Amino acid sequence: MKTTLYQKIFDSHLIYEDKNTTPIIYIDLHLIHEVTSPQAFDGLRLKKRLVRNPLKTFATMDHNVSTISRKISDSKKMAKIQMRTLIKNCKDFNIPLYDLKNINQGIVHVIGPEQGMTLPGMTVVCGDSHTSTHGAFGALAFGIGTSEVEHVFATQTILQNRMKNMRISIYGNIKKNIFSKDIILNIINKIGTSGGTGYVVEFSGSVIKKMSMESRMTICNMAIEMGAKSGIIEPDAITYNYLKNKNFVPKNRSWKEYIRKWNNLKSGPKSFFEQDFSINISHISPQITWGTNPSQVIPINGKIPILKDIQDVNVREDTERSLEYMGLKPGTSLLNIPVDKVFIGSCTNSRIEDLRVVASVVQNKKISDNIEALIVPGSGLVKKQAEKEGLDKIFKNAGFQWRHAGCSMCLGMNEDQLKPYERCASTSNRNFEGRQGPKGRTHLMSPWLAAQTALYGKFVHIA
């Protein structure tokens, strides 16, 4: 068949399409949080509408929650208003909510998969850019704006133009201490922050097939950072084993029936991709960003680009601006540059697999005296599992702060922020100017490299 995985899901959810209007597709799962939903609820009230299908809508608190306390009253003024508003809205419209008192609360793109809400073949939307995370399950998942949130509330549908198809096949032998975060940063460096614009990117190849679901989620999470609408991976036995016995997986069919259905969710051998890349990752070293967008990446033992070597004027100007903001110089190495904070968390790297990697690095060691380091699990269940395994003790003995679940320092929307000019080694997904706090300097990397940075208090290359 010539139909891609993306096209199969789009077509199976198509409600209406003609030459003169934007196609309308059905939405299987609508995830919401406290930041982008209030205005949408207000719009419903103004128009005297109800949420069309509350059982296909699910809410959590994550973006601006305190990670020190589970009390709403301990958060900032606006955060308190938003969380209390979410509670009221969910009660008024009969939407299930994981609030701060619930062990299942967490980052929306962590709890959806771990609860089994996200299933192969689904359409999933959320008022958040990194909804593409759910594409790791063979779902069509993408972020939407607040007006679209209201539209989905009211109709359980969305107007959505068809995207083009891009495939990125990843192959090679993964070297020691190379993780999915390194792979996706390397790809974004090659493709650029706008290379995926107008596309849904299907990730495939021998490396993807061997990845855990946690690693696949990291890959799809950052597809948006290359400008793509979404990232997607065909489901397989690894997907099915992850989902088996999850809370929200419907029980109205046998497991074999689900697998038989999901096995059809794949691109055919003759599927057409407008762009088709093959990337060998055998050679890559741990990756780190040096600038203010996720494509400004070098190996940890590499050097920042030299300005005169950059032919494109716009790219050269962006590079100059990024270097000035980051307090760095062209042609230099990041090695031995001191760091102020280390943040391990976010919807990119806050799952149990990530925390186990960090624990393996820092066990029986101490972080550097100049470092403030925090580890923020992606959900209450991740926190519970980590504590069951004794990882929290390893972290605290090493000098890390062990927090409650939330988005935390990924974005400057809660108490966890950088001070001006502080430099942070972060496992999050965006290194934009001010992303982690006004004038804060963010370097993106894997949990493994972030843990090493915490131990040494500076950027290091461990061969």
UniProtKB/Swiss-Prot annotation:
GO biological process, any: L-leucine biosynthetic process
GO molecular function: 3-isopropylmalate dehydratase activity; 4 iron, 4 sulfur cluster binding; metal ion binding
Signal peptide as annotated in the record: none
Reactions it catalyzes: (2R,3S)-3-isopropylmalate = (2S)-2-isopropylmalate
Keyword Lyase: yes
Cofactor note: Binds 1 [4Fe-4S] cluster per subunit.
Sites where the protein binds [4Fe-4S] cluster: C347, C407, C410
CDD domains assigned to the protein according to its UniProt record, in alphabetical order: IPMI
The protein's required cofactors: [4Fe-4S] cluster
SUPFAM superfamilies: Aconitase iron-sulfur domain (SSF53732)
Highest taxon listed in the record's lineage: Bacteria
Biological or metabolic pathway of the protein: Amino-acid biosynthesis; L-leucine biosynthesis; L-leucine from 3-methyl-2-oxobutanoate: step 2/4
The EC number(s) this enzyme carries: 4.2.1.33
Gene3D superfamilies attached to this UniProt entry: Aconitase, domain 3
Sorted UniProt keywords: 4Fe-4S, Amino-acid biosynthesis, Branched-chain amino acid biosynthesis, Iron, Iron-sulfur, Leucine biosynthesis, Lyase, Metal-binding, Plasmid
Role: Catalyzes the isomerization between 2-isopropylmalate and 3-isopropylmalate, via the formation of 2-isopropylmaleate.
NCBIfam families in the record: leuC, PRK05478.1, PRK12466.1
Oligomer and partners: Heterodimer of LeuC and LeuD.
Family: Belongs to the aconitase/IPM isomerase family. LeuC type 1 subfamily.
Name used for this protein in its record: 3-isopropylmalate dehydratase large subunit
